[in-house]
Amino acid sequence: DTWPSRPVKIVVPFAPGGTTDILARAVAPELSKAFGQQFIVDNRAGAGGNIGAELVAKAPNDGYTLLMGTVGTHGINRALYKSLPFDPIKDFVPITLVAAVPNVMEMNAEKAKQLGIANVQDFVKYLKANPNKLNMASSGSGTSIHLAGELFKSMTGTQMTHVPYKGSGPALLDMVAGNADVMFDNLPSSMQQIKGGKLVALAVTSSQRSAALPDVPTVEEAGGPALKGYEASSWFGLLAPAGTSPEIVNRIQQAVAKSLGTPEVKEKMQAQGAIPSGN
């Protein structure tokens, strides 16, 4: 049969509302338009992205199950877990990069105000005086969000209590509710809450400022000598099970590249703080 003759599933290995989910939902309708078949986002959260990634690694290589992979599922987890239920290189064929994304160091706005924290240096000062007083939410152990926070702790010699969630979506709900204090989230998932004033962005984790938040400094810029050289950013891309036909891979790659080039998708992504990067 000519691919696609039925709906195609894009597995997101995290809960709804996070950046992986936002990017998959930006690309899916464009692929549906390009191929005249539905591309459906399927959230399979857990184990820092490993559950969803394993599902795709073991799926038939017929082009009907794709993965929105991340620097976590295909980079970090290999170093973090003793054994993975899949091989991030051998079990997949990369289709295309979708976006590069800075993380943002953010606090619950009320909490920051209450503690008199207006910038990165205030934050470090508070932590030095109150070790482990603040809790640090993440999208799961070993995700880029978790490691961006750990890097910050190790460079500044500070301590926070790590609270892992099953994705940014649930972590953000607790951040907004004031149950979690600080997070180094991927910028797109937090953008709305920052713009709405629920969260305050102290810094971005990339080496340069983000065009989406031009007034927010980088961690390195705001943090003084202890944070010189600090940088943490993430990538997101589409992958298929190993052995998927090169023809299908090429067709998807071209359709994604075309959609990322359209002003509509480009602007949507950039407004969220993602940098579209089809290759």
Residue ranges and their predicted role:
Residues K58-G63, A79-P170, V219-E221, W235-K268, ...:
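Hinge/capping helix and adjacent helix->loop/strand transition within the periplasmic-binding protein
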Residues H74-S83, H146, L151-M155, D181-T218, ...:
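A ligand-binding cleft/hinge motif common to bilobed small-molecule-binding domains
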Residues Y230-E231:
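HAMP domain helices
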